[in-house]
Design a protein with these regions (language model features):
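Short, flexible helix-loop junctions that flank or precede catalytic/ligand sites
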Residues: 1-346
Length: 346
C-alpha cells in the first residue's frame, strides 16, 4: 500500500502475515520514498571510502557487487550509486524485486515470478535494450550470475547485490553459482560489503576517556583529522533521540577495488585467505578501518561495532588480531567516564 501524508512524503507500507496457533503474526515494513533516495554525499562516507567507491563507479564497464545480510542497507547503497551515475549521459536500466523507489530518468522493471518473469528473463531482455548501466536487485541463482558476468564483460556497467558476509567471500559465492573464475575475474571491478550501526545522538552523547591500551586505533590514526581529540563516546538520553541515545543508522563499508593482481588471483582460484591478504595490500578499506574511524569520530560506540561486525567470518580469513583488543577496550571504557569516574558497563 501507498500512504500519502498531507503535505508530506509518500510512505510505502508492506505487510506480511502468517498464521500461528495464537493468531495472525503480522510484520509491517515502512519505506519513506523520499528519505530513501540519498546521494552518495549524504552517506557519511569517509573521504578515502568515497574516493574508492567513486573510482569504481567511473569505470565504463564491469561488475560491482554490493553484499551483506538482509537489512544491511544494500538497496540504499545501490540507489545512491544510481543517483551518482544518473547524470543524463547514460541509459540506466534496473531489475528489481520489487521497485522500492521511483527514480526519474531511470528505466525500472520489476520481476514477476508468477508469470515466469524473474531476474534471468528480465536480464536477458534488458540486454537487448542497449543499456549502459544495469542494476540487478539480487543475484540469487546461477543463470542470473552467469548473465551478469557476461553483460559486464560485453561493455556494460553492472551493479548487483548478493548475500555475502565479507567482500572476498562474494567471490566464492559467485564461483559456487557456476561462474567460470576466468570470466568472473575479467568482469570484476569492485566489491562492497557493509553493515549498519546506530549513530550516536550528537546532542546528548557522553564523553568517556580513551582506554590506556588504545592499540585498536593504531591503523586508523592516519585516517583521522589532524586535530582529532583522543576521546570516545557512549549514548546519553534526550528528547531529540527519544531517550534512546542513538539516531539514524549509518553505513560501515568494506570497499575492495580490483586491480590486475587481484583479478589474476581470482582467475587462478587462489585461497580466500591469500586473496584477503593481497586485498589489504592493494588499498582496500577494511571493516576494521571503517568501524574504528566511526568510533574515533564519535559517530558510534565500540559496543555497536562488536554487535554488527562479522567476527566469525573475519576469523576464517585470519583477520582476528583486533577482536580481543576491542573487547579489552570495551571493558576498560565501561569502568570510567570522561572525568575518570567509574561508570556502569553498557
Amino acid at each position: 500500500w501507498l500512504l500519502r501524508r498531507d503535505g508530506q512524503s509518500t510512505i510505502d507500507l508492506r505487510v506480511n502475515c502468517i498464521p500461528t496457533i495464537f493468531g495472525d503474526d503480522i510484520t509491517m515494513r515502512l519505506l519513506d520514498r523520499d528519505v530513501g533516495l540519498m546521494s552518495l554525499d549524504h552517506f557519511e562516507f569517509q573521504p578515502r571510502e568515497y574516493d574508492l567507491l567513486v573510482s569504481v563507479l567511473r569505470r565504463p564497464s564491469g561488475l560491482l557487487l554490493v553484499t551483506g545480510p538482509t537489512g544491511s542497507g544494500k538497496t540504499t547503497t545501490m540507489y545512491g550509486c544510481l543517483q551518482f551515475l544518473n547524470d543524463g549521459s547514460r541509459k540506466i536500466n534496473t531489475l528489481e524485486d520489487p521497485v522500492e523507489y521511483v527514480v526519474k530518468g531511470i528505466r525500472q522493471s520489476q520481476v514477476n515470478p508468477k508469470f515466469g518473469v524473474d531476474f534471468p528473463e528480465l536480464l536477458a531482455a534488458c540486454l537487448r535494450q542497449s543499456p549502459d548501466v544495469i542494476m540487478i536487485g539480487e543475484i540469487r541463482d546461477p543463470k542470473t550470475a552467469l548473465t551478469a558476468v557476461r553483460a559486464a564483460n560485453s561493455g556494460h556497467l553492472v551493479l548487483a547485490t548478493m548475500h555475502s558476509p565479507v567482500a572476498v567471500k562474494a567471490i566464492r559465492a559467485m564461483v559456487t553459482f557456476g561462474v567460470h573464475p576466468q570470466n568472473f575475474a575479467e568482469s570484476l571491478i569492485g566489491i562492497i560489503s557493509q553493515r549498519l550501526v546506530r549513530k550516536l545522538c550528537q546532542r546528548c552523547r557522553q564523553r568517556i576517556d580513551l582506554p590506556e591500551n588504545d592499540a585498536f586505533l593504531d591503523d586508523v590514526r592516519p585516517l583521522l583529522p589532524h586535530d582529532w581529540t583522543p576521546v570516545l563516546y557512549e549514548p546519553g538520553r534526550c528528547e531529540e533521540c527519544h531517550n534512546v541515545g542513538f539516531t539514524k543508522p549509518i553505513c560501515v563499508p568494506e570497499i575492495l577495488p580490483f586491480d590486475t593482481e587481484l583479478r589474476r588471483m581470482v582467475a587462478d582460484c587462489r585461497p580466500l585467505v591469500e586473496l584477503d591478504r593481497a586485498a589489504h595490500g592493494s588499498g582496500m578499506v577494511t571493516f576494521r578501518q571503517a568501524a574504528m574511524t566511526r568510533v574515533a569520530l564519535g559517530q558510534t560506540t565500540l559496543q555497536e561495532v562488536m554487535r554488527v561486525v562479522p567476527f566469525d567470518d573475519l576469523r576464517e580469513l585470519e583477520r582476528e588480531e583486533w577482536e580481543e583488543p576491542l573487547r579489552s577496550a570495551i571493558r576498560s571504557a565501561s569502568h570510567s567516564d570522561g572525568n575518570g569516574q567509574p561508570t556502569a558497563a553498557l
